[in-house]
């Protein structure tokens, strides 16, 4: 078993879409970044990369590379999962927290979980996403940005239950 932790933050600005967990969230501002700036998927990607000892997303998808301009972070997460899979790992579980004063995200969390589970080739029951505010404290509380934290537990594929291995083999 291996565990990794990830964190990401992006500034909220006008003229950008707000994408979290691969979901387009209706809001008057979006996150500024080289890619689609999906802080949730970036934090999860960093957690997985940390668990396999492969650095962070900046190493794999540098913001100086035009190939990643406007990149879909679901595709980046799928690439990261491929690196873990190539090393014999599967997702044990992912637990992630989005920190945002606004907008309210509860209604979007189920779809975020589904998107993440699909990208990570696992069951939705292994993915937990939650959202919290900072009670109007700090940059998130002032609505200047959104942050996300994630922890990923990876298991060797042979350590998974026979039922889970069967599900993964059909994907």
UniProtKB/Swiss-Prot annotation:
Keyword field contains Lyase: yes
MF terms (GO), sorted A to Z: 2-C-methyl-D-erythritol 2,4-cyclodiphosphate synthase activity; metal ion binding
Protein species of origin: Geotalea daltonii (strain DSM 22248 / JCM 15807 / FRC-32)
One matching Pfam family: YgbB
Keyword Signal among record annotations: no
Quaternary state and interactors: Homotrimer.
The enzyme's E.C. designation: 4.6.1.12
InterPro entries linked to this entry: MECDP_synthase (IPR003526), MECDP_synthase_CS (IPR020555), MECDP_synthase_sf (IPR036571)
Reaction catalyzed: 4-CDP-2-C-methyl-D-erythritol 2-phosphate = 2-C-methyl-D-erythritol 2,4-cyclic diphosphate + CMP
Binding site for 4-CDP-2-C-methyl-D-erythritol 2-phosphate: 8-10, 34-35, 56-58, 61-65, 132-135, 139, 142
Protein name: 2-C-methyl-D-erythritol 2,4-cyclodiphosphate synthase
Cofactor: a divalent metal cation
Family under the similarity heading: Belongs to the IspF family.
SUPFAM superfamilies reported for this sequence: IpsF-like
Residue numbers binding a divalent metal cation: 8, 10, 42
Function summary: Involved in the biosynthesis of isopentenyl diphosphate (IPP) and dimethylallyl diphosphate (DMAPP), two major building blocks of isoprenoid compounds. Catalyzes the conversion of 4-diphosphocytidyl-2-C-methyl-D-erythritol 2-phosphate (CDP-ME2P) to 2-C-methyl-D-erythritol 2,4-cyclodiphosphate (ME-CPP) with a corresponding release of cytidine 5-monophosphate (CMP).
Keywords: Isoprene biosynthesis, Lyase, Metal-binding
């Amino acid at each position: 078993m291996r565990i990794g932790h990830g964190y990401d933050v992006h500034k909220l600005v006008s003229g950008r879409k707000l994408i979290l967990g691969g979901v387009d969230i209706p809001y008057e501002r979006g996150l500024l970044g080289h890619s689609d700036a999906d802080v949730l998927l970036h934090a999860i990607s960093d957690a997985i990369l940390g668990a396999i000892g492969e650095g962070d997303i900046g190493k794999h998808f540098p913001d100086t590379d035009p190939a990643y301009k406007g990149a879909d972070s679901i595709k980046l997460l799928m690439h990261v999962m491929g690196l873990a899979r190539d090393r014999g790992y599967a997702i044990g579980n992912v637990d992630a927290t989005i920190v945002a004063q606004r907008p309210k995200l509860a209604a979007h969390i189920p779809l975020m979980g589904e998107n993440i589970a699909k990208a990570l080739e696992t069951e939705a029951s292994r993915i937990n996403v939650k959202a919290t505010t900072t009670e109007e404290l700090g940059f998130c509380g002032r609505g200047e940005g959104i942050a996300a934290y994630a922890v990923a537990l990876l298991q060797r594929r042979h350590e998974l239950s026979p039922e889970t291995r069967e599900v993964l083999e059909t994907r």
